[in-house]
A protein has these predicted regions:
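N-terminal amphipathic alpha-helix/helix-capping segment at the start of soluble metabolic enzymes
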Residues: 1-22, 116, 279
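Active-site mouth loops of central-metabolism enzymes
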Residues: 15-33, 52-54, 71-79, 135-148, ...
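Hydrophobic faces of well-ordered beta-strands that scaffold small-molecule active sites
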Residues: 18-24, 49-51, 73-77, 95-97, ...
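Glycine-rich, proline-tolerant flexible connector loops at the mouths of alpha/beta enzymes
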Residues: 25, 30-31, 42-65, 96-104, ...
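Glycine-rich phosphate-binding active-site loops on the catalytic face of alpha/beta enzymes
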Residues: 47, 91-105, 197, 220-234, ...
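Alpha-helix-loop-beta-strand connector modules within alpha/beta enzyme cores
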Residues: 55-77, 110-122, 182-193, 280-281
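Hydrophobic or amphipathic alpha-helical targeting/insertion segments
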Residues: 82-123
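Catalytic alpha/beta core domains of metabolic enzymes, predominantly
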Residues: 127-130, 135-281, 289
Length: 354
């Protein structure tokens, strides 16, 4: 079991559930824009927010943001150790640093002293793009062992100053290297791991890489907190992270829609129906629907359709221009093809209201 780390009022590690994080892409000094994005992220289900703090203007913005919000806020620090100290003074619930790029042991000692004094945890965040020169020289390129060595070396530096309120991340944009590096550190350290695939890319490719990289780690029981990194609106990261956790059975929340791939037996426009069910289910969740771990099955024919539909909370098995609705394993009624999506979502809503 991993060590417990408290970030504001949120626990990471130990027996705590896996938390979902994101990072604002607004300038931190633009307080109003950043607060608007934080509110959207919170509404989507984000549990920890990270903000960049590159200079004094950002520090002052960070201070005001902390005054306005309750969600745990992490300060992301690079190069200038003084910004880490200033961010802690401004109320940071955690700081993220790469000890190797803030200017030597004395600077790290100063940051650690302030963090210990204020009971603020530190994430040691190592990336494939910023490995130490001696490690790159030893391995010739970015490797899993090199990433793990860098992370553990920097953790040891914090421990040298009697600091152990630590979270570790070691991210690569290469899914296999990323996976192997986390496995190494997971076996060699009891600090909680912040998992993700860095620079995953645009949503189309980034979601594939994140599903493979993060999903593989989660299936092995590795990871205490996670961020899906996408070149997109950060809110999209949260939606995908929640969907990933639900798909793996780690969280039971929201509405999960499953549908068959179709074949020559399909006699309805199943793709259109499934997309409409997903759209309506999404709208229902956005409206504050309180359902937990609901599964909807949209099936195209009589081969697997009735069985799959009965296994789901709600489902439809389609025939020629129509569908047979199921709820909680029981047959409900037949409906016309054009009414399937509406009637299926109505079943969900009616059960909730009954």
């Amino acid at each position: 079991m991993k060590k417990d780390i408290r970030v504001g009022d949120t626990l990471i590690g130990g027996t705590a559930p896996i938390t979902i994080q994101s990072m604002c892409n607004t300038p931190t000094e633009d307080v109003d824009a950043t607060m608007e994005q934080i509110r959207r992220l919170e509404d989507a289900g984000c549990e920890i927010i990270r903000l960049t703090v590159p200079d004094e203007n950002a520090v002052e913005g960070f201070r005001e943001i902390k005054r306005r919000t309750r969600i745990p806020v992490v300060a992301d620090i690079h190069f200038d150790y003084r910004m880490a100290i200033a961010a802690i003074d401004a109320g940071a619930d955690k700081i993220r640093i790469n000890p190797g790029n803030i200017g030597g042991e004395e600077n790290v000692r100063a940051v650690v002293r302030k963090a210990a004094e204020c009971h603020v945890p530190i994430r040691v965040g190592v990336n494939g793009g910023s490995l130490e020169r001696d490690i790159l020289a030893r391995y010739g390129r970015v490797t899993a062992r090199g990433l793990a060595e860098s992370a553990l070396r920097n953790v040891a530096l914090l421990e040298k100053f009697d600091f152990d309120d630590i979270v570790i991340s070691l991210k690569s944009s290469d899914v296999k290297i990323n996976f192997d590096a986390y496995r190494i550190v997971n076996e060699e350290s009891d600090y909680p791991l912040h998992i993700g695939v860095t620079e995953a890319g645009t949503p189309a490719r980034g979601k594939i890489k994140s599903a493979a990289g993060i999903g593989a780690l989660l299936l092995e029981g590795i990871g205490s907190t996670m961020r899906v990194s996408l070149t997109a609106d950060p809110v999209e990261e949260i939606h995908f992270a929640k969907a990933l956790l639900t798909s793996l059975g780690i969280r039971e929340e929201g509405i999960q829609v499953v549908s068959c791939p179709t074949c020559g037996r399909t006699q309805v426009k199943l793709e259109k129906i499934a997309e409409e069910v997903e759209r309506r289910a999404g709208k229902l969740m956005e409206s504050g629907f309180a359902g937990k771990g609901i599964k909807l099955a949209v099936m195209g024919c009589a081969v697997n359709g009735p069985g799959e539909a009965r296994e789901a909370d709600y489902g439809v098995a389609c025939g020629r221009g129509e569908g047979l609705l199921f709820a909680k394993g029981k047959t409900i009624k037949k409906v016309k093809e054009e009414d399937i999506a509406e009637e299926l979502i109505r079943l969900v809503k009616n059960d909730r209201d009954s």
